[in-house]
Amino acid sequence: MSTVASAVQVLLSSCPDEQTARGIADALVAEHLAACVTILPGAQSVYRWRGQVERAAEHVLLIKAPAATYPMLERRLLELHPYDVPELLVLPVHGGYLEYLRWLEAVDD
């Protein structure tokens, strides 16, 4: 794994609707917590919640960000997200196109 790759991360979160997804994406990018957020509409989630199997249409966020912003990014996402327990998973980046990784890492520039 390259040093640049280990300095960036991809985060996964799901939102109940487009308005929420756009609001979170806009805030994370505007506040320099993420370099890019891709909104994937049309996801169907099946999960267990409070003893029941639930189904929901959701919008998935793929958040690309420097690893150093994670604590602030998590705090901000939790402030903006309407779910009691929002999904927020950090996926390790083991490699990628070097120029793209450098761009992700330089979110503050």
Where are each of the predicted segments found?
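Positively charged, small/polar-rich N-terminal and surface patches that mediate targeting and assembly
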Residues: 1-109
